Amino acid sequence: FFSDIFNNIENYVFLLIDYGYSEREFYHPERSSGTIQYYKNHKKIKDSLLNQGNFDISISVDFSRVYRIANLFKLQLMSYTTQEQFLLNTNILENSEKITDVFTRNNILKSLLFPTDMGENFKIMILCDHMKSDFIINFKDYRHKL
């Protein structure tokens, strides 16, 4: 997969957004049964045997592994951060003011930003083939966790 992408394009920024963890978190004993999760209507389902075929299946990304693969292709890691940090630093609060219904706006922001929702569970990894020295990403940096 990565070979097909990174060997055939130049001058790019690769943005990976998904559920996931660093290696230490990914293989934590708490997740000894894996990271597979089932969702229906944006709600987690505990019993996957009920309503088979009527839910989404999600498996978390091992971002440390992605980082090691990126190194094989000599890619630069520009950023590794949480969805919360990414969205806050790309002006989600200002942009959300366009949503006039305060209740709706607050529910959307809560879902996207709160650590117990998507804010900490989704990670953002930004890779590129040539680091631009004048391009600075000011997100809270979690690269040390990889």
What do the PLM-derived regions correspond to, one by one?
Residues F1-L146:
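Long, Lys/Arg- and hydrophobic-enriched amphipathic alpha-helices
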